[in-house]
């Protein structure tokens, strides 16, 4: 099993993507530490928690730095150094025109999607330094790569998350730690339900996207889980600071051409000059 004797911390494991990722790492032999927020424990309790000593569950609000520190410390005491961090905690935030957005809700979105990611990475890095290795996988989204009207908090937080990932990759390149971000595609999830409930507030583009999702059933969460496993494995060594689409990028074929990718601007946020 590829991840035997490895410890994986999954932030936001009670969602559809987080649950699929947790199951995947468990099957590959990892020690799996899972976090959930408030009411979303039940689904986890019925699944992985019944599978024995390689699984542990922690309640966590990523907006609280001291709580993040405490959970990371508890994971270290139970399982030892953390080798893999997967941060798939996130919210869609306010949907609609920015001038009507709740200031509290807008800022809360930034806190969870961006600041929470910083807190978790900041807390886990010393453990990875001690282990002498590490893989960090962040979850971004379509709002990071292009403007997303009526979802300004979400798109701003996800774009910032990608730039955070790119910048940190450079800091960590001599530490044997790689960090990348995933765009999972339209997975059927809690966000999908929130988008439907918003009606026309998200604009015509969102309405059309929702219709397409309903027709196709969306992207399976297992697709994002498979990419997560790849990025956490030795097969992705050297690949860092990239935003990779689980759906549109041919990441299954990338292992042999990682040096080529890393010598280019592929899968990064860049300003496109006028020719």
Regions found by a protein language model. Give the residues of each.
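Conserved glycine-rich cofactor-binding loop
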Residues: 14-15
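Conserved glycine-rich Rossmann-like NAD(P)H-binding loop of the short-chain dehydrogenase/reductase
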Residues: 28-43
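Active-site helix of classical SDR
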Residues: 121, 157
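C-terminal helical subdomain
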Residues: 181, 201-274
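Substrate-binding pocket helix/loop in short-chain dehydrogenase/reductase
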Residues: 96-98, 105-107
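The beta1-alpha1 cofactor-binding region of Rossmann-like NAD(H)/NADP(H)-dependent oxidoreductases
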Residues: 59-70, 103
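Alpha-helical segment proximal to the catalytic Tyr-Lys
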Residues: 126, 170-171
């Amino acid at each position: 099993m590829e991840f035997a004797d490895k410890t994986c911390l999954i932030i936001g494991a009670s969602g559809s993507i987080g649950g699929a990722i947790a199951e995947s790492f468990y099957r590959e032999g990892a020690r799996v530490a899972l976090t959930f927020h408030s009411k979303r424990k039940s689904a986890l309790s019925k699944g992985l928690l019944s599978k024995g000593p390689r699984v542990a569950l922690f309640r966590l609000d990523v907006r609280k730095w001291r709580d993040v520190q405490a959970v990371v410390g508890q994971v270290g005491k139970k399982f030892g150094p953390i080798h893999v961090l997967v941060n798939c905690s996130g919210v869609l935030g306010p949907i609609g025109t920015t001038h009507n957005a709740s200031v509290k809700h807008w800022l809360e979105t930034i806190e969870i999607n961006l600041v929470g990611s910083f807190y978790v990475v900041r807390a886990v890095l010393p453990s990875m330094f001690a282990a002498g290795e590490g893989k960090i996988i962040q979850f971004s989204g379509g709002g990071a790569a292009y403007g997303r009207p009526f979802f300004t908090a979400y798109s701003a937080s996800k774009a910032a998350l990608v730039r955070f990932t790119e910048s940190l990759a450079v800091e960590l390149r001599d530490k044997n730690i790689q960090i990348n971000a995933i765009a999972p595609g339209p997975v059927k999830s809690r966000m999908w339900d929130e988008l439907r409930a918003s009606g026309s507030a998200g604009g015509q583009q969102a309405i059309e996207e929702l219709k397409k999702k309903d027709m196709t059933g969306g992207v399976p969460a297992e697709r994002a889980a498979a990419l997560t496993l790849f990025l956490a494995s030795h097969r992705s060594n050297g690949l860092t600071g990239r935003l990779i689409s689980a759906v549109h990028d041919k990441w299954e074929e990338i292992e042999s051409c990682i040096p080529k990718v890393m010598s280019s601007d592929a899968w990064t946020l860049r300003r496109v000059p006028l020719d």
